């Protein structure tokens, strides 16, 4: 099978590396996004897929707008590929591009389509508290994640897993599924299944305002927001920004889902304690060697990892000691 791979971030790397290892797959080249400026020096930095392509001496294209780049389109057409495999590329492909490969364009999408179409399916599925997510391969069409589905695999998600951790697991699952899809599709074993548009939901790009923590929300809603939009959710303390990147919801509804080392907190932090009259955002406890416990709109939230303004990421307990945090202080005050 002759393949052109399209992808950009680290999520796409396992799929590319898996294709490179397969004896019946010939990767003709890679299309990826242009280098971006980042870091303190604002230097141009290659994306993860480009690094892999260079390491394997693969032909590489980095068009600013692929559907407008005549030279890239001519090159791709001349390759006479069997498949284009697209994993988190970052640009919409035109009908002209979709028609180039002999057997179609296969997309690897990080959700159980038709749910969570769009740019951030992992993040929004965690934000919404989904306990299952997965990978779908599909035949691409001109819409955004609307193509006919080929194969799906499901992944169970733990209460404490964040978007980065789930992304890593889905990337590996997706790599296996891409190869399985290609092998079945090339011999005509797959029957594409049209998506039920009435069941579609969407996962748009995350906006700056999505990162703000509202302590009037329930502990579980905040937990899901923090792990979904990891590591960038933010509140404030003493008028200074405070990022929160790992938490633990406290309350009887969650004990069975927590690791054993945290279940020892159960006798101390009953539901009745969180029903007391504390303003949301208040520090209502200091769990030794763990971190501060914050009152929410429903239940308590233990802060396990934070990043104060101008400082490194630190444990909740280091934060308690470094900030000399006191019971009764309040987060989120402007």
UniProtKB/Swiss-Prot annotation:
It catalyses: L-methionyl-tRNA(fMet) + (6R)-10-formyltetrahydrofolate = N-formyl-L-methionyl-tRNA(fMet) + (6S)-5,6,7,8-tetrahydrofolate + H(+). PROSITE patterns: GART. Keywords: Protein biosynthesis, Transferase. The keyword Glycoprotein does not apply. GO terms for molecular function: methionyl-tRNA formyltransferase activity. GO terms for cellular component: cytosol. The keyword Zinc does not apply. CDD domains: FMT_core_Met-tRNA-FMT_N (cd08646), Met_tRNA_FMT_C (cd08704). It comes from the Bacteria. Belongs to the Fmt family. Pfam families: Formyl_trans_C, Formyl_trans_N. Attaches a formyl group to the free amino group of methionyl-tRNA(fMet). The formyl group appears to play a dual role in the initiator identity of N-formylmethionyl-tRNA by promoting its recognition by IF2 and preventing the misappropriation of this tRNA by the elongation apparatus. It comes from Cyanothece sp. (strain PCC 7425 / ATCC 29141). Disulfide bonds: none annotated. Gene3D superfamilies: 3.40.50.12230. This is Methionyl-tRNA formyltransferase. (6S)-5,6,7,8-tetrahydrofolate binds at residues 111-114. Its EC number is 2.1.2.9.
